[in-house]
Amino acid sequence: RFKKIRRLGALPGLTSKRPRSGSDLKNQLRSGKRSQYRIRLEEKQKLRFHYGLTERQLLKYVHIAGKAKGSTGQVLLQLLEMRLDNILFRLGMASTIPGARQLVNHRHILVNGRIVDIPSYRCKPRDIITTKDKERSKVLIQNYIASSPHEELPNHLTIDPLQYKGLVNQIIDSKWVGLKIN
C-alpha cells in the first residue's frame, strides 16, 4: 500500500497509515517529463486504488458516466462517492474503505432496515444507513467512530453517533470529493 501511496500521492481511503517522509527522495530522482499517457494512467490508478475497484468495475462506471448528462468526470466521481462502502468511510463508521467493505460483507450494515452485503450498492438520497441490532456490530462501529479523527462531514451526509445511524441527504457536490483528480 505504501508503494502505491508513494507513487500516486495521498490516497485517504486506502489506509490510515502514512509512509515515512524520507522516501520522497527516490521519486524526485526518477521524475522527468511526464507524458500524457502517464498522467492519465496515474489518475486512473488513483481512482482504482482509492475506491478499491477492479479494472472491469471502473470501466462499467466510466461507461455509465459517459451516457449520463453532464461532465463525465463529475458524474463518475458522484457515482463512486455514492457507493455504500465509501459512504460508511465518509461517515466515519470505518477508518478506511477496505474496512468499510469488510463491515458490509460481514452483514453488519442495514440500508433502510434491510441487510445489504454488497459494498458497491449505490445509495440514493434519503437512504438511512444503520448497524445491525447485535451488540457485536454496535461495538465495531462504536470503536471506529471513537478512534477516527473527527473530520468535517460532507454536506450530503448526516450522522447520529449515539444511534449509529447515517443519512444520505442528497447526491454529493464535486467540491466534497476527498481525492484530487487531474
Curated annotation (Swiss-Prot):
Return one Gene Ontology term, BP aspect.
ribosomal small subunit biogenesis
Identify the PROSITE patterns for this entry: RIBOSOMAL_S4 (PS00632), S4 (PS50889)
- State the UniProt keywords alphabetically: Chloroplast, Plastid, Ribonucleoprotein, Ribosomal protein, RNA-binding, rRNA-binding
Among InterPro entries, the record links this protein to: Ribosomal_uS4, Ribosomal_uS4_bac-type, Ribosomal_uS4_CS, Ribosomal_uS4_N, S4_RNA-bd, S4_RNA-bd_sf
Localization? Plastid, Chloroplast
Ranges for domain S4 RNA-binding come to 82-143
Annotated SMART domains: Ribosomal_S4, S4
Q: Which residues form the signal peptide?
A: none
Supply one GO CC term from the record: chloroplast
Instruction: Give a GO molecular function annotation for the protein.
Output: structural constituent of ribosome
Question: Could you tell me the superkingdom of the organism this chain comes from?
Answer: Eukaryota
- Entries under Pfam families matching the protein: Ribosomal_S4, S4
Oligomeric state and interaction partners are given as: Part of the 30S ribosomal subunit. Contacts protein S5. The interaction surface between S4 and S5 is involved in control of translational fidelity.
Q: Which NCBIfam families match?
A: PRK05327.1, rpsD_bact
Family statement: Belongs to the universal ribosomal protein uS4 family.
Give the matching PANTHER family.
30S 40S RIBOSOMAL PROTEIN, SMALL RIBOSOMAL SUBUNIT PROTEIN US4M
What this chain does, per the entry, is described as: One of the primary rRNA binding proteins, it binds directly to 16S rRNA where it nucleates assembly of the body of the 30S subunit.
Name of the featured protein: Small ribosomal subunit protein uS4c
Please report the organism this UniProt entry assigns to the protein: Neomarica sp. (strain Lejeune 1997)
The record's gene field reads: rps4
